[in-house]
Amino acid sequence: MYKVLVVAYYFPPIGLSGVQRTLKFVKYLPDFGWQPTVITTGKIAYFAYDETLLNEIKDKNINIIRVGAKDVNALLGKLGTKKPPREKIRKVLNRISQSIFIPDNKKSWSKKAARKIEELLDKEHFDLIFVTGPPFSAFVEIAELKIKRNIPVVYDYRDLWYESYFSFYLTPGHKFRHYKYEYFALKNVNKITVTNRKIKEKLLLDFPFLKHTDITIIRHGYDAEDFEKTPPIAKENNKLLIVHSGNFIEYTTPEFMLQALRDLQLKYPDVAADLEFHFIGIMDKKYQKLIKKYKLELIVKTYGYMEHKEAVRKVKSADVLWFMIGRKKNIDAILPGKLFEYIGAKKPIFGSVPDGAAKSVLEEYEASFISEPDNVEQITETLVEIYNLYKDNNLPVPYSKYVEKHERRVLTEELSKVFQFLLKE
């Protein structure tokens, strides 16, 4: 059995979809000859916790080493789950943080994690280090460690770093420092995995020393076990049920969908009366106020954050799932893991998205409806189209082979092959 160190700040019991990719890799890597040891954060304050996620690997003999630090979340850790700030406040705090901490505010943790890895390497042999980002400060620290120790390293880009859809640069100097850090990190890595082709293309464009063969695309996926072992929540009626699972953050908003539902009530009252829209996840108060303002209480129900297992049950109960990405710079490179949880449910998906990686996935999935993210009239008419197909029992079905290739075990086997080929070089 080969041994791999997995460096991941975001890991259970932290909740939300960002931890799923790494958790599932760790869960299935032993099936392909790789025993992971996880280096992750200690007790921190975070928007959501899901203690049940660790149950997935409790019988896998996975060593999880928790490294504390002095980042803001760690200092608030005694509070446990923290309430997310309102969107305007969150944006301000995020910009302040990005102006002070380069490459990110997890630098303290990343340095401590690297020191812990050095201690481990002094005691036992590991074949490879796998680092997932963000936080990208972990890439920098592991790059420095690689120079010292000459151990093979693989970076996993869950999102873009330089000029990402999340980035804010106070000055050109801030922007240059980010580029310099990423340049250094990429000069000291063996292989790279990314979640979609757009990220790969941007890395190759921004860092011309990289070769196509340096970067492997391993998309997000779904765990078949999550869906096979989890029964759906029974529907309360025969109305068309559309479900959205996930939080609304900087590049997503329910605003245009809520406007479309308002217009649906005015233009197509019979359709609106025979439809329900359920939101799972943290929703800003301003959107909850819109629900009341538009008098949507009979159509829209909000459920707040659910543990992953319960969220899967709710997703399975839906007739159609809604997915949204707004307009932002380089947004074409974003491909949230939530979309592949939807694919795992094998339900029709209504995507309100711009051109980009997510739209391509929806088109390949086939059981999809696509609108512009902010075209309220188009969203309204698409809802009517979906409703009519539902009443005719003629909703589209997904392309089965496309669904199967995004199963987590299949994707983890792809990752194990990246590891194996690296060791042979």
What is each model feature region?
Residues 137-140, 144-148, 173-194:
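Membrane-proximal helix-turn-helix segments that form the acceptor-binding/catalytic region
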Residues 149-154, 163-184, 224:
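Nucleotide-sugar donor phosphate/pyrophosphate-binding loop at the beta->alpha transition
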Residues 272-281, 286-312:
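Nucleotide-activated donor-binding/catalytic signature segment of Leloir-type glycosyltransferases, i.e.
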Residues 234-252, 258-261, 411:
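Conserved donor-binding/catalytic core segment of Leloir-type glycosyltransferases
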Residues 374-378, 391-421:
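A charged, aromatic-enriched C-terminal amphipathic alpha-helix characteristic of glycosyltransferases
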Residues 72-78, 204, 213, 221-238:
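Acidic anion/phosphate-binding donor-loop and adjacent secondary structure
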Residues 198, 218-221:
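Carbohydrate-associated surface elements
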Residues 1-72, 191, 197, 413, ...:
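N-terminal subdomain of nucleotide-sugar transferases
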